């Protein structure tokens, strides 16, 4: 996922299914980042941190939607 991540406000407008799909994509991206880090081919380590934060943001909004 190379594009800029949506803000929490934008994420709140998405459906629960869309959020689950985005969370799955971010988990896959994190897995790829982990493999790249282990092989030494991760160009920008800050991207891994950003992906972790993006996943946390998506999961937070998803939890808020399911409890509401």
Swiss-Prot record:
The keyword Acyltransferase does not apply. Residues 45-56 have a biased composition (Basic and acidic residues). Keywords: Ribonucleoprotein, Ribosomal protein. One of its GO terms (cellular component) is ribosome. One of its GO terms (biological process) is translation. The keyword Ribosomal protein applies. SUPFAM superfamilies: Ribosomal protein L29 (L29p) (SSF46561). Residues 32-68 are annotated as: Disordered. It comes from the Bacteria. InterPro entries: Ribosomal_uL29, Ribosomal_uL29_sf. Pfam families: Ribosomal_L29 (PF00831). GO terms for molecular function: structural constituent of ribosome. HAMAP family: Ribosomal_uL29. Belongs to the universal ribosomal protein uL29 family. This is Large ribosomal subunit protein uL29. It comes from Myxococcus xanthus (strain DK1622).
């Amino acid at each position: 996922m190379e594009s800029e991540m949506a803000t929490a406000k934008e994420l709140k407008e998405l459906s629960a299914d869309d959020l689950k799909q985005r969370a799955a994509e971010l988990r896959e991206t994190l897995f790829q980042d982990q493999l790249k880090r282990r092989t030494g081919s991760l160009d920008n380590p800050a991207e891994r941190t950003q992906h972790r934060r993006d996943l946390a943001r998506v999961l937070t909004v998803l939890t808020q939607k399911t409890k509401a």
